[in-house]
């Protein structure tokens, strides 16, 4: 019998990858989205007919959400925000209160598995509201549904991301690019396909009650990441370290934008490395190492940011 997966946050890069993976392996998927007309078609195209159902609902409409749990075997929460917005999109609501609601429903309806996507590095970043809300969410989940498995990925990248693609767009346009904290913050970028494989492994092996840190094969500083991206798109740019007071001032200005490039809270996060803490199991420990090399993967789609785009004939300097 095919198992039924209920996914929250299915329209993002991780959600779309996961829907394809699950439906190819005969799982039936129900995806909750707040805007059916805006996101429904993009989600629907990720799977064959009959394997996916899309429900339009506000995630805090508990009456509507509750009805979906009666036939749910596996609940997956991929919802997260990087900055606070309007209409109740606060860190506390999205990262703390909503996961708590899901955990209680999972317990009430005896759901077999609850998989929650958190974030790496949150234990150290105690001065960040983002990190505090993520930790609160994890605590609420463990309190209400002890069988839940929590995944903590480092930065996730792919052609559909808002990480490498945003950086390459900015590096294309700006002659000078700022380095916060001298660009020394380390990340362990994990490809979206690898993270999807890890989630599928947790489901198929029926893993419970774990916190798993999910990382790629390399620890790379932000400065190194920017240099690799510049090399891939054949650009020379000046990378300038910013004093903290200047960085904080730019964050104050940027966070006034509808889609801020940087906020004060994100600046706090950048003080801390986003790599394995070694306090919890890693994806390698559960037999799912990520082998995709950052530069090799980005090379597959970076041509869109080179001069000439897909028709670019100039090869980048691999040295």
List each language-model region with its residue ranges.
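Flexible, glycine-rich beta-alpha linker
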Residues: 126-129, 149-170, 185-186, 220
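Substrate-positioning beta->alpha
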Residues: 162-164, 181-203, 210-213
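Conserved Rossmann-fold NAD(P)-dependent oxidoreductase catalytic core, especially the SDR/UDP-sugar
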Residues: 28-30, 81-82, 88-144, 149-154
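A hydrophobic C-terminal alpha-helical subdomain
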Residues: 245-319
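N-terminal Rossmann NAD(P)H-binding glycine-rich loop of SDR-like oxidoreductase domains
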Residues: 2-31
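Glycine/proline-rich active-site loop of Rossmann-fold NAD(P)-dependent oxidoreductases
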Residues: 158-166, 202-212, 218, 234-237
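NAD(P)H-binding glycine-rich loop region in Rossmannoid oxidoreductase-like domains
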Residues: 37-41, 45-101, 105-108, 120-124
């Amino acid at each position: 019998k095919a198992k039924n997966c209920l996914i929250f946050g299915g329209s993002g890069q991780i959600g779309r990858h996961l829907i394809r993976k699950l439906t190819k392996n005969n799982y039936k998927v129900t995806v909750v989205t707040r805007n059916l007309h805006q996101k429904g078609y993009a989600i629907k195209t990720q799977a064959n007919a009959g394997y996916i159902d899309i429900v339009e609902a506000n995630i805090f409409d508990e009456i509507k959400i509750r009805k979906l749990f009666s036939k749910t075997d596996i609940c997956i929460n991929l919802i997260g925000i990087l900055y606070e917005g309007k209409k109740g999109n606060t860190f506390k609501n999205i990262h703390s209160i909503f996961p708590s609601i899901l955990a209680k429903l999972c317990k009430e309806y005896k759901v077999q598995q609850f998989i929650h996507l958190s974030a790496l590095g949150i234990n150290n970043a105690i001065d960040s509201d983002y990190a505090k809300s993520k930790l609160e969410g994890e605590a609420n989940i463990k309190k209400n549904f002890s069988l839940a498995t929590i995944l903590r990925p480092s930065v996730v990248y792919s052609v559909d991301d808002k990480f490498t693609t945003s950086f390459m767009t900015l590096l294309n346009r700006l002659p000078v690019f700022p380095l916060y904290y001298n660009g020394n913050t380390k990340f362990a970028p994990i490809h979206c396909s690898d993270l999807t494989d890890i989630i599928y492994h947790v489901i198929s092996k029926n893993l419970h009650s774990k916190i798993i840190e999910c990382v790629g094969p390399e620890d790379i500083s932000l400065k190194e990441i920017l240099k690799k991206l510049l090399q891939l798109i054949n650009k020379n740019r000046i990378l300038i370290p910013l004093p903290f007071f200047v960085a904080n001032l730019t964050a104050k200005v940027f966070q006034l934008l509808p889609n801020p490039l940087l906020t004060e809270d994100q600046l706090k996060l950048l003080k801390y490395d986003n790599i394995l803490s070694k306090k919890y199991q890693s994806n390698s420990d559960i037999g799912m190492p990520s082998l995709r090399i950052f530069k090799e993967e980005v090379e597959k789609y970076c041509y869109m940011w080179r001069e000439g785009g897909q028709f670019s004939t100039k090869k980048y300097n691999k040295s």
